[in-house]
Amino acid sequence: MERVLRVLEYEKMKKQLLEHVSSSLGRKKVEQLTPSTDFNKVKLWQAQTQEGANMLRLKGHVPLGGIFDIKPHLKRAKIGGLLHASELLEVASTIYGGRQLKKFIETMIEEEEADLPLLGEFARQIVPLTDLERAIKQCIDDNGHVLDSASPTLRTLRHQIRSFEANVRSKLEGITRSSNTAKMLSDAIVTIRNDRYVIPVKQEYRGAFGGIVHDQSASGATLFVEPQAVVEINNQLREAKAKEQREIERILSELSMQVSEHVDDLFVNVDVLAELDFIMARAHYGKAIRATQPILNNRGYLLIKQGRHPLIPDDEIVPIDIELGHSYSSLVITGPNTGGKTVTLKTIGLLTLMAQSGLHVPAEEESELAVFKHVFADIGDEQSIEQSLSTFSSHMTNIVDILGKVDHESLVLFDELGAGTDPTEGAALAIAILDDVYRRGARIVATTHYSELKGYAYNREGVMNASVEFDVETLSPTYRLLIGVPGRSNAFAISKRLGLEEKIIEQAKAHIDEDASQVESMIASLEQSQKSAESDWEEAEKALQEAEQLRLDLQKKLDDLEKEKERILAEAEQQAEQAVKDAKEEAEVIISELRDLQKQGVSVKEHQIIDAKKHLEEAAPKLTKQQKKVKRTAEKKREFKPGDEVKVLSFGQKGHIVEKVSEAEYQVQMGIMKMKVEASDLQLIDRPQPVETKPLATIRGSDHHVKPELDLRGERYEEAMLKVEKYLDDALLAGYASVSIIHGKGTGALRKGVKDLLKRHPHVKSARDGGANEGGLGNTVVELR
């Protein structure tokens, strides 16, 4: 397997993948990566990569910073070892990074931004460990330095150390600045030797300061002396620093103990973060090479659409289309050397290995790849040459090994099968090997430049010819794979283009037997036919795309027209509602003016009534379709008699017939107004049978009677409110000082609605619940003004 991974450049692909990891955890996972032969595992890996790609597509990034491989630290803490401050800081940073990633994934799931069942399960396994992180961060700063605030003792010791250091420096600087001692010093500085403060003294003044010599210069001319005056302070400083170190170790030991208490959770977190970093590296790499998730199968079927070798730059690669394992299980790619056949072979092999490693592949959507138990490749490489094997021996050694392992779950890639020996024998061997592997049910892709194998592909069921297109004009391969067309050597055409004399080419052709010449002509014809068919297909595809675009454009215009229609209808409806509102307000103003005249005892003249009617008619909105329908219904001939209660349809008001004026016109009393109304504008109102005799009031100037109470029981809320408004108007015109509105107790909704309406009514002086003998809470007594 190692050789296959090498010749198919799997390790080079992994180096590209390594560029996308975020931590040493992910790096280790990539370094350990090998293709899996377990179909279910490969499906799982692919699904994980797809979820990672979805997160990248939606968010653009995933927080994976600050994560370290802390397993060595955890193992040491578990056995009671002391962790250094920098190691504890890595533990805290990894806890924080894990918690941030957990929150990021779970937030996306909660907000339903993406369906992430696999990554969500990983996120759920991460233990937050906030208290442990906080404990470490309170003691250690971001540079790995233990803070003064880590303990009261440490704060005191550090204060003492700073005091001692300031004291000793002050004394030594006093010596260096003194004019009496300046000539004795090599330099006027204070420095440190053996963790003690010293000054540089010339050799000849060694005894001038007393104290201890800690070091000397390379020449011996300068001695680094700790003067006697600061020896005691330096001793105190050193002792304080020793105590400081012991206190730091105590703090680190305590924190290490806390880590050991959570070591199992931390191991889980590290494993989960390693997986998530690995998954996101695969997703990032897929994005970088414009890869897609392949469809997987375990039937040995390959369908690669516009597949690209990931190691070849985009501006140099020519995508390939290939199918294998359906109508044919062997593909023989023929043609001259250096024609791109090996690149095709490596692309098929590497994309298969990538898919079986959970990586998306650089190919178009709907590409399909099989999960093989074995992938074999006989492709020449430098290592075989270094082993001093001939080309033929190298190939044959590898082929013998392959034939000993190949089965129906294998993909076998042969490059230049049978090369390196006598062409006749080599071709015969190649055919025999292909037949043997085919009988075992393996999927085969083989390249060769032997003409004999072109005929082999035509004569065997389940075997297909293919070639890599070659441009004889530019004398270079186009690297386009042509399925169903065998390759030509193009030796004569190339030689002619390079300037070889025509007579030599003709002599060479004479040495080729007629059958071989006919085969070459047939292949040339096939190539031309295929090019023509592909050109026709491309034109048909273009026409189909143009037709589809036209359909989409027309659909958009239709949708736009529908939206415009809806907008116009909505605008018209809004205008109609406003017209009705304006008309109602105008009518209320006119009625209010007439009421005021009534209250003032002013006699309403006929011309005033006519003017009011005219204003009402002007205020009335244009009839809607529904109103027109009602009007047409009302236009049916009908007879009314004096006293009939009617509804005037154009005003929506009730009144009663005073007299018949003409064949199709009646005088109608509406409140204080009398007006002539066409019969078609009237609707008869059936009078209810009287239940009991109640005292009635008569509206002045009319024979319309108004009862002293209004019974709303059984009425719907909206209709009840309208009846209350009209009843109050009628009661005012009838001269009542107070009236009763019977609404019943029920749910209380009707009672509340009546109370609210009465509070807003300008002519209601007060309203109270009925007394014990007045119906109680089921009745409201209204005092009018």
UniProtKB/Swiss-Prot annotation:
For this protein, what is the EC number?
3.1.-.-, 3.6.4.-
What the entry lists under Pfam families is as follows:
MSSS (PF20297), MutS_V (PF00488), Smr (PF01713)
| InterPro entries listed in its UniProt record | DNA_mismatch_repair_MutS_C, DNA_mismatch_repair_MutS_core, DNA_mismatch_repair_MutS_sf, MSSS, MutS, MutS2, P-loop_NTPase, Smr_dom
Tagged with keyword Ribonucleoprotein: no
Binding positions for ATP per the UniProt entry: G335, P336, N337, T338, G339, G340, K341, T342
> Would I find RNA-binding among this entry's keywords?
yes
The protein's name: Endonuclease MutS2
